Amino acid sequence: MVVEEEAIPVKDAVRGACEMLGYDVYQVANEGKMVCVVSADEADAALAAMKANKYGVDAAIIGEVCKKPEDRGPRVSLRTGFGALRIMDMLVGEQLPRIC
């Protein structure tokens, strides 16, 4: 799977806070978000359905599943703004959500 970094909707305040604190924006706890894996044939319809809801206004297609595992290996890769690929590693340790 290849995820396009520039396609992931991240609010400026969140990105700025992560940069100041040295956090990886893709590894911090995040409530109220969803990732869906949808057939390419249905992607536009699924996106339109999500955007039709007030909670889905920032919904976006952020990547694609590669046809052959050998194309990218068994991992999720992130294509950076510079076009380079890097592995999106699994979180190490505990992800602590905000305590309400």
Predicted feature locations:
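Short gly/pro/ser/thr-enriched loop/turn and capping motifs at secondary-structure boundaries
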Residues: 8-12, 34, 66-69
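Compositionally biased, intrinsically disordered low-complexity regions
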Residues: 27-28, 44, 68-71
